């Protein structure tokens, strides 16, 4: 199985309509400054632990800065048995240009 690359519009619909895990794989400071609402910070150090403990049936949307690093993380999650994994094309920068964001104080 492969992960699917999706546009910010597809991601927006997915986030609005489904119970989905949103995984931010950028650095901690960037995450704390601003992120997609309800995203969890998934550093490379936390990735293996997450892969072992998370519900693999629940869809996961992975994003990074520009949509490059998220692809390798998405592929890793698929290889770990996650059934439905998405990578955000254009990453957080594209999301931010079109949709609301949140910060550490707001969630």
Curated annotation (Swiss-Prot):
GO terms for biological process: glycerol metabolic process. It is found in: Cytoplasm. Residues 16-104 form the Rhodanese domain. It holds the Pfam family Rhodanese. Coiled coil: none annotated. Disulfide bonds: none annotated. Transmembrane segments: none annotated. Gene3D superfamilies: Rhodanese-like domain. It catalyses: thiosulfate + hydrogen cyanide = thiocyanate + sulfite + 2 H(+); thiosulfate + [thioredoxin]-dithiol = [thioredoxin]-disulfide + hydrogen sulfide + sulfite + 2 H(+). Keywords: Cytoplasm, Transferase. PROSITE patterns: RHODANESE_3 (PS50206). It is an enzyme of class 2 (transferase). GO terms for cellular component: cytoplasm. The keyword Membrane does not apply. InterPro entries: GlpE_sulfurtransferase, Rhodanese-like_dom, Rhodanese-like_dom_sf, Thiosulf_sulfurTrfase. It comes from the Bacteria. The active site is at 64 (cysteine persulfide intermediate). Its EC number is 2.8.1.1. Belongs to the GlpE family. Transferase that catalyzes the transfer of sulfur from thiosulfate to thiophilic acceptors such as cyanide or dithiols. May function in a CysM-independent thiosulfate assimilation pathway by catalyzing the conversion of thiosulfate to sulfite, which can then be used for L-cysteine biosynthesis. PANTHER family: FAD-DEPENDENT OXIDOREDUCTASE, THIOSULFATE SULFURTRANSFERASE GLPE. This is Thiosulfate sulfurtransferase GlpE. It comes from Coxiella burnetii (strain RSA 493 / Nine Mile phase I). The gene is glpE.
